[in-house]
Regions:
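Pocket-lining segment of extracytoplasmic ligand-binding domains
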Residues: 1-80
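Residue-level "edge-of-site" marker
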Residues: 10, 28, 91, 105, ...
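Short secondary-structure boundary/hinge segments and terminal tails
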Residues: 15, 33-34, 95-96, 133-138
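Short, structured secondary-structure boundary patches
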Residues: 26-29, 43-48, 107-111, 140-150
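Helix N-cap / beta->alpha transition motif
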Residues: 27, 41, 102, 132-136
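Glycine-rich, flexible loop/turn motifs
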Residues: 34, 40, 93, 127-128
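Secondary-structure end/capping motifs
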Residues: 46-125
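Conserved C-terminal helix/tail region of periplasmic/extracytoplasmic solute-binding proteins
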Residues: 117-153
């Protein structure tokens, strides 16, 4: 028994179906923006640039496939993830399939850093992190030049 949950779709829809009339949805559009980020150590990126570039190209191809063939992409998701087709159809519109690096990522991690300091998870005497020193868009720019929407040093 729980008082509240916060989950990604399609599991929110599944919880609603299981909970019936006892479940209430608190709508908070754009309260949270879900991203999936690719991370690599700098030494790995330098040594494996070709491999990382291939991964980025494969993701871009997958995004193009999803956009060109949404019904088939949904069928694959249903088959491979075992999710009910009605659930997939109901949550599909909230997803944005894109290979990109956006200003919002930097804004989000900066906000998380401020929260961590404010809540005492980070010692106050530590300097603010320089996130731009840890973000490298060079390989993504080679694969998809328009995928990065802000200027990096």
């Amino acid at each position: 028994e729980v008082d509240a949950i916060s989950v990604w779709e399609p599991w929110g829809k599944v919880a609603l179906n299981l909970g019936g009339a006892n479940v209430e949805v608190l709508q908070a559009p754009r309260l949270y923006s879900q991203t999936f980020n690719l991370l690599a150590r700098n030494d790995y990126k330098q040594a494996q640039a070709k491999r990382i570039t291939s991964i980025l190209m494969a993701i871009d191809d997958a995004v193009a496939f999803i956009k060109a063939n949404p019904d088939e992409a949904k069928r694959i998701l249903v088959r491979d993830a075992g999710v009910d087709p009605d659930v997939v159809d109901s949550v599909w519109p909230i997803y944005r399939f894109e290979l990109s690096l956006q200003q919002s990522l930097l804004t989000t991690v900066q906000g998380q850093a401020r929260w961590a300091r404010r809540e005492g998870h980070v010692p106050a005497e530590l300097p603010d992190p320089e996130f731009l020193n840890n973000i490298d868009s060079s390989l993504l720019r080679k694969v998809k030049p328009n995928a990065v929407d802000f200027v990096f040093p």
